[in-house]
Amino acid sequence: MKKRSFIKVIFYGLVSLLLPLKISAIEKKIINPDLTDEQKRIMFREGTERAGTSPLNFEKRKGSYHCANCNAKLFESVSKFDSGTGWPSFNEAIPGAFKTKVDYSFGMKRIEYHCAKCGAHHGHVFNDGPGPNGKRYCNNGLCLIFIPE
């Protein structure tokens, strides 16, 4: 390992231990009383479902994807694509659907996104997606409800 990489790993590791991992002004509110314990863990404790476990990975019908907690419309099916990551992925969100914050967990900097209506954590957004904006919204499938057209 190069010295610079080693120092970077040590620095981010110390930062993640010394600072709160998630600093947020995002207000979170459980609205759906029927959420499972696993959905609550992901949506309100910033968890992640296992890759490849969501049936939504294989959903190909036209429709829209909504927050499993508050039913806010988040994505249209035309923005869904197979990223090969094992999580439902989208290249464009409904305008105003999400609030973002920086996540320093696991010694790296990522952008986490939350439902703007209820604050539920949905996943991370990366700059390696297809299309003109280059975004890849990597979403936990348990956080979504698909509503066909």
Please identify what each model-predicted range represents.
Residues 26, 32-149:
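A short Gly-Trp-Pro
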Residues 1-15:
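N-terminal secretory signal peptides and thylakoid transit peptides that target proteins
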Residues 14-29:
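Bacterial Sec-dependent signal peptides at the C-terminal "C-region" and cleavage site
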